[in-house]
């Protein structure tokens, strides 16, 4: 007769629903779950669904004031991971209503915000997300995309070439600009600020921007080609970041750069909107990604961070090189490279793609192969990445 009974209860009673048929509007997630010894996989999967949606550790009377059935995440399928002991892929469906429109920040806060510290789990990794068109349509996405960038630069049918200016720290702005000019004059399309170059005592950002702009215009005049330098606008505050982007626009240069993980998705999305409104291309560096994506059984796979960036906005993103790594790695990398570039990507577990993804004409992002590559890698790089890529040397 008691209408309400408190106490700890199993999550799987409410959140494990193997008979659930996913909706076209659901956000689907694939988690690699390693339960603690003695915790059944259904309970672990349901715990993930609960804690990343409407659940808390007990029943509360306010649950009766809403429709949990409408708002709860559901673990709808669990499968063991081949070759791994006590690891499972748990598939979770989230109703679209749980997420704020146009906010990657809110999406991640909900899906991966709390659940990774969960006691019932030894480890947890978000392997993939299916973003439904109903949600992706609430995002601007990349400021320009691959085709518009090629049209702006008048460069077709080949990868774009770039290099990072070294030594990355310690040069004066004048000498930095000299190096930029030599590289661009020598035939590169782009040069790049290193991700650590922001505005340090030995080279303040405004001086660097001026000397780099001078180098760009000189090289353009002498070669008759359009040149660019990724001016790093990353800063300690969003206001300062936008200030730097405004100055780049005033100089008339074609592209700025941002570290999207250290800078954060909120700042990145603001910058992407500014770039579209003002005709700037946006180059994205992924500093800090390995902190999140390197462990095989815990964290977030980079393909999820790549999808999130396509939604938040960027025209280029660093995506690894593949060169000299294992074959399997190559397939996985090509999987998320296609997720960045293509309109429609079929589910293909051999490439790590857990869901079919339809981007419905959201602009594509150019993958940037960067990090320890040199001229002898060229044949492999062009074969792996094809024409729609940026090969970033140095």
UniProtKB/Swiss-Prot annotation:
Catalysed transformations (reactions): 2 (2R)-3-phosphoglycerate + 2 H(+) = D-ribulose 1,5-bisphosphate + CO2 + H2O; D-ribulose 1,5-bisphosphate + O2 = 2-phosphoglycolate + (2R)-3-phosphoglycerate + 2 H(+)
N6,N6,N6-trimethyllysine PTM positions: 5
GO cellular component, one term: chloroplast
Pfam families linked: RuBisCO_large, RuBisCO_large_N
InterPro entries: RuBisCO, RuBisCo_large_chain_AS, RuBisCO_lsu_C, RuBisCO_lsu_C_sf, RuBisCO_lsu_fd_N, RuBisCO_lsu_N_sf
Enzyme Commission designation: 4.1.1.39
Cofactor(s) needed by this chain: Mg(2+)
Transmembrane segments annotated in the record for this chain: none
UniProt PTM: The disulfide bond which can form in the large chain dimeric partners within the hexadecamer appears to be associated with oxidative stress and protein turnover.
Active site: 166, 285
Any one GO biological process: reductive pentose-phosphate cycle
Top-rank taxon, per record: Eukaryota
Protein family per UniProt: Belongs to the RuBisCO large chain family. Type I subfamily.
Self-association and partners: Heterohexadecamer of 8 large chains and 8 small chains; disulfide-linked. The disulfide link is formed within the large subunit homodimers.
Official protein name in the record: Ribulose bisphosphate carboxylase large chain
Lineage start: Eukaryota, Viridiplantae, Streptophyta, Embryophyta, Tracheophyta
